[in-house]
Structure formats: structure tokens, C-alpha cells
Amino acid sequence: RDCRSQSKTFVGLCVSDTNCASVCLTEHFPGGKCDGYRRCFCTKDC
């Protein structure tokens, strides 16, 4: 199961899952995706 946490360092509107995932890597998460409100959420197994 995936747990989600909003990115602390992502700035601006999230339009690219790739950019979001890159920022999440710097926050020690394995990945991330944009949600419907254009925010970046980092994901990890929980």
C-alpha cells in the first residue's frame, strides 16, 4: 500500500510527475506524483 505526504520543498504548480518525483527523491522518498489540485505528493510503501 502507498502512503502519501505533501512535498515540503516543491514550489509552484505541479504539472509534471517527473519533476515531482525528482523533488521527492531529495526528501528521501522513492517517488511522487501530482494530484488533482496541482500539488506534489511524495509516495512510499507503508
Swiss-Prot record:
State its role: Plant defense peptide.
Superkingdom per UniProt:
Eukaryota
Please report which protein family the annotation says this sequence is part of.
Belongs to the DEFL family.
Q: Which Pfam families match?
A: Gamma-thionin
Q: What is this protein called?
A: Defensin Tk-AMP-D6
Which residue windows are transmembrane per the record? none
Which SUPFAM superfamilies does the UniProt record give? Answer: Scorpion toxin-like (SSF57095)
Oxidoreductase found in the keyword field:
no
UniProt keyword terms in alphabetical order: Antimicrobial, Disulfide bond, Fungicide, Plant defense
Q: Which GO terms describe its biological process?
A: defense response to fungus; killing of cells of another organism
For whether the record's keyword set contains DNA-binding, the answer is no
The chain's disulfide connectivity reads 3-46, 14-34, 20-40, 24-42
